[in-house]
Amino acid sequence: MKTLLLTLVVVTIVCLDLGYTKTCLKTPSSTPQTCPQGQDICFLKVSCEQFCPIRGPVIEQGCAATCPEFRSNDRSLLCCTTDNCNH
């Protein structure tokens, strides 16, 4: 009986761990989304393009497999690995 109980506990722990998914905030509404498998990094990128003085900066949030590259028109780039950390 103890063996059966121990087996059930181990199976439950393994299943709970396998079912974990990352959530990140996603533009345009900054609502949490479940990231696709393999995309375990949340990012927040703020960039300024040609019409930035008129329209303001472009904000992009989402999931990624790797941290996006910092480009010349980017003002800031945040990459993090905890749920909804890209705010």
UniProtKB/Swiss-Prot annotation:
Residues 1-21 form the signal peptide. It is found in: Secreted. GO terms for cellular component: extracellular region. This is Kappa-2-bungarotoxin. Keywords: Acetylcholine receptor inhibiting toxin, Disulfide bond, Ion channel impairing toxin, Neurotoxin, Postsynaptic neurotoxin, Secreted, Signal, Toxin. InterPro entries: Snake_3FTx, Snake_toxin-like_sf, Snake_toxin_con_site, Toxin_cobra-type. Homodimer and heterodimer with kappa 3-bungarotoxin; non-covalently linked. The keyword Kinase does not apply. Postsynaptic neurotoxin that binds and inhibits neuronal nicotinic acetylcholine receptors (nAChR) with high affinity (IC(50)<100 nM). Is a selective, and slowly reversible antagonist of alpha-3/CHRNA3-containing and some alpha-4/CHRNA4-containing AChRs. Belongs to the three-finger toxin family. Long-chain subfamily. Kappa-neurotoxin sub-subfamily. Disulfide bonds join C24-C42, C35-C63, C48-C52, C67-C79, C80-C85. GO terms for molecular function: acetylcholine receptor inhibitor activity; ion channel regulator activity; toxin activity. Pfam families: Toxin_cobra-type. It comes from Bungarus multicinctus (Many-banded krait).
